[in-house]
Amino acid sequence: LPALSQPRHAPHDRRSRRRAETRERIFRAAMSLFAERGMAATTVEDITELADVGKGTFFNYFPTKEHVLNALGEIQLGNLAAALEDARDGTDPIAEVLQRLARALAREPGRSPALVRSLMMAHLSNDAVRERVVDVLGQGRGILAQILRIGQERGEVRREADPLVLARIFQQTMFGTMLFWSMHPGAPLPEWISQTIGHYCASIPAEGRSRAGRRP
């Protein structure tokens, strides 16, 4: 009967959805444990127990526990890609695009000061993690530079500034803010980020532009 018919691709879609849900569950379990114990003290067994999956299932998605952080990198690169689309759309000033992006980038780390500390330690102490972070930061810097270049083309960002340098300063501002917040938590991380990135945005407008970077 037509009412009971399913599209031919539906089983594949369901499998894909289940795989995505399982991967998300493993990722969330790992992030929770990294925040609680640190990455070094967390085992794959700990993660699979909390995620309620078998070790074989874990290794279907991640070769090692360190590779779980790849998922975080994917999330952040997705946030950057979305911001680039916003910038190309041209509806909002670049300063607002950057502010939204900063809040989006802070969303995952902002779940816990302990998580930020754990991630920072992993970046510093694990070569595989550090290499992946360097790669993600490089990709992110390239996307940020494209966003800032769009701002320059619109006359919203200083043309004499190198977009890649401005992108690096944006990343440094984000990292520094997250590190300080992790040591002195109080207000939510997005509030810290809004303040510091607000100062960043106030420093980059082209001469004669308003602090908000709005076009006339």
Spans of features found by a protein language model:
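Basic, helix-initiating cap at the start of DNA-binding domains
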Residues: 1-37, 41-53, 66-67
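An amphipathic alpha-helix adjacent to DNA-recognition modules
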Residues: 20-28, 40-41, 52, 61-85, ...
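Key DNA-contact positions within bacterial/archaeal DNA-binding proteins
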Residues: 56
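Hydrophobic alpha-helical connector segments
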Residues: 71, 82-114, 163-170, 190-194, ...
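Amphipathic alpha-helical packing segments from all-alpha helical-bundle domains
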Residues: 78-81, 111, 128-154, 164-168, ...
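Short alpha-helical scaffolding segments that buttress acidic/His motifs in well-ordered protein cores
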Residues: 105, 119-120, 170, 174, ...
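Amphipathic alpha-helical segments used for helix-helix packing
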Residues: 109-130, 146, 179-183
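Hydrophobic/aromatic-rich alpha-helical bundle segments in the mid-to-C-terminal region
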Residues: 130, 152-198, 209-216
